[in-house]
Amino acid sequence: MNKFRTTMVAVAAAAALVGLTACGGSSSSASAPVEGDWDAVVAAAKEEGSVMLYSSQKPANLDALTAAFEAKYPGIDMEYVRGTDSEINPRVETENRTGTGIADVHMTTDASWIENAAESGKFSTELVGPDLDAPAFDPAASVINDRFFLTSAAVFGLGWNTAAVPDGVSTPQDLIDPKFQGKIGIVNPTGFASYVDLYKYYAKNFGEDYWNKIAELSPRVYPSALAVAQALTSGEVTVSPMVQPLVTEVAAGAPVDWALPDKPWGTPWYSEVLSASQHPNAAQVLANFMVTAEGQQALNGGYAAVLPDVEGAVARAQDIASPDIAELTPEKVEQYSQEWQTLFQG
């Protein structure tokens, strides 16, 4: 099976749908995993032969997860579609409504969506993997309604191009400097609950007028933190107050570096096994693998991991507080998005 990995979720999902149709896939939602022990689920997963993940995680980490999963389960091909939460979540809803599941496992940071979906149980099936009950995973603190499980957490900090800013920066306030006019990279939060929370957090912790001062420096706006990291690497911008730890980029020799401020902002990813999955057993196997030591090391270089002592992780995901969803209702996200557009795009 040919793999595809892209940030263009609509294109990728369409391609997957064509492939599913060509293989004679059913248009109705699949059943629950087989009855029996975990070995029976794994055997059934190998019979299904493939699994699809929708995620807003970093492509390099999703590539690493794919390689690690396929090494552990060579009989199961893993594919993923990478997109933002605002792209992926509506597709999950559509696939659930139509019963034509493309995704098998869904990984998102949208706290409001997670809470509502976990409460309704509409989109997911109960988890059965043994590692989701492991004491090191701390299921009491990591699983919501036996449907959503903590998988990772993004921690945001400061990033800079080492050629342009050899001394780096250490606080978000360091970016408020005329020398960075037109060279600051920021993420457009429009429609993204997580990024709206980030902007509000910075204003609360680094000054209510922080973003007004940044706006005066004519920052360059990007659709995601990944795009900001790429712009830092190319030198299109020289600093950013909002990047995920640039561990992968530094390891690859890119001219960038990063640091966490004293009060870094973070947001957790939760995942679910989708009820519209056409590969219900493979979905459970992938979900379980994601919380094993191998899965966590692959997925969380530069991120917070759900297990202790994971090489490459920068924090423990259980220590990253979830956003206050009362402040992230669709109405409040829309209101803040409009305020942001007025400030930065006038």
Regions found by a protein language model. Name each.
Residues 52-66, 78-96, 100-236:
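Extracytoplasmic ligand-binding site segments that recognize negatively charged/polar headgroups
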